[in-house]
Amino acid sequence: MFNMINLLDLSLEDLKKWMIENKEKEFRAKQVLDWVYKGVYNFEAMKNIPKVITNKLQENFYLSVPSVVQKYVSKDESTVKFLFKYNDGNIIESVVMKYKHGNTICVSTQVGCKMGCTFCASTIGGIVRSLSHGEILGQVLKAQEETGERISNIVMMGSGEPLDNYDNSLNFIRMVNAENGLNIGQRHITLSTCGIVPKIRQLAEENLQITLAISLHAPNDNIRRKTMPIASVYSVEELIEACNYYINKTNRRITFEYALVSNLNDKEVHAEELATLLKGMLCHVNLIPVNKIDEKDFKSSSTNRIKNFSNILLKSGIQTTIRREMGSDINAACGQLRRRYVKNNSKEV
């Protein structure tokens, strides 16, 4: 099977081309993918596909979504956390968050992460490998199957750095956005990055209308370098310049993610410095109480300090929200469940 291709890694155009090359009508490609997006992963169960075609498909492709290793539902049932396993045994996490306006899934783009952000559990142990776009898509399809509900929004904020897996991340976006795919609007898709400056500029040229989220977490280089190794490669000034380039190219508002760590980046002077840094930008700041990680000693800011930080930004004209905490009772923060699973098993999976 591992010498064959997962059909989920093919776009409609790819499959049309394959059909033509194999002397079949190209409309069969859409019929096959229609079944796939309905959750049918057995070629023989595709009732309107002739046997001669299903035989060819079985000889060249396999259809696989990840299996569920563990599933956790929060007490209020607003959050469902999945540990998914791929065919090679690697484990990743996905989280479904249920809102009044629809269901959002947080997907992983890599197994582990090499970026080394110190407040993120996903990066402990480094990166194992990147996921193909079909493997990322499989998270969405499996989550829909497990919850019995449609996913209407996607955030690429799970383990991994999407821009370090650039081609697969963009192919995934285009596949879920396609009318013949999940038909999720680009403005309902958010890509989060720690700030790989050249890739942000490259993304600006892609003619996409997705939301770009930047993990900023500090108003200056000195603080940012303490928690994010990427800050030693690209300065805050370079990052903001790339963000302004992205805004000018796409006319899309950028979200800046800011995890508040007690006595590190949460003082009034930091809020004022951040307000100055972002003044005049088409942007929004999302303040995040930092998550507790067993291996780390970070402490979240107090509720009062978070509110005060928010008020300073708001008074400076910076659109600001405080992230609603969801799934805290099931360790739904990025990387925590996978890390615990790996620690409790004698062999890395």
UniProtKB/Swiss-Prot annotation:
One of its GO terms (biological process) is tRNA methylation. It catalyses: adenosine(2503) in 23S rRNA + 2 reduced [2Fe-2S]-[ferredoxin] + 2 S-adenosyl-L-methionine = 2-methyladenosine(2503) in 23S rRNA + 5'-deoxyadenosine + L-methionine + 2 oxidized [2Fe-2S]-[ferredoxin] + S-adenosyl-L-homocysteine; adenosine(37) in tRNA + 2 reduced [2Fe-2S]-[ferredoxin] + 2 S-adenosyl-L-methionine = 2-methyladenosine(37) in tRNA + 5'-deoxyadenosine + L-methionine + 2 oxidized [2Fe-2S]-[ferredoxin] + S-adenosyl-L-homocysteine. The keyword Iron-sulfur applies. Binds 1 [4Fe-4S] cluster. The cluster is coordinated with 3 cysteines and an exchangeable S-adenosyl-L-methionine. Its EC number is 2.1.1.192. The keyword rRNA processing applies. Residues 99-329 form the Radical SAM core domain. Disulfide bonds join 106-334. It is found in: Cytoplasm. GO terms for cellular component: cytoplasm. Pfam families: Radical_SAM (PF04055), RlmN_N (PF21016). Coiled coil: none annotated. S-adenosyl-L-methionine binds at residues 160-161, 192, 215-217, 291. Keywords: 4Fe-4S, Cytoplasm, Disulfide bond, Iron, Iron-sulfur, Metal-binding, Methyltransferase, rRNA processing, S-adenosyl-L-methionine, Transferase, tRNA processing. [4Fe-4S] cluster binds at residues 113, 117, 120. Its main location: cytoplasm. It is an enzyme of class 2 (transferase). One of its GO terms (molecular function) is rRNA binding. CDD domains: Radical_SAM (cd01335). The active site is at residues 93, 334. Signal peptide: none annotated. Its cofactor is [4Fe-4S] cluster. Reaction proceeds by a ping-pong mechanism involving intermediate methylation of a conserved cysteine residue. Specifically methylates position 2 of adenine 2503 in 23S rRNA and position 2 of adenine 37 in tRNAs. Belongs to the radical SAM superfamily. RlmN family. This is Probable dual-specificity RNA methyltransferase RlmN. It comes from Clostridium tetani (strain Massachusetts / E88). The lineage of its organism: Bacteria, Bacillati, Bacillota, Clostridia, Eubacteriales.
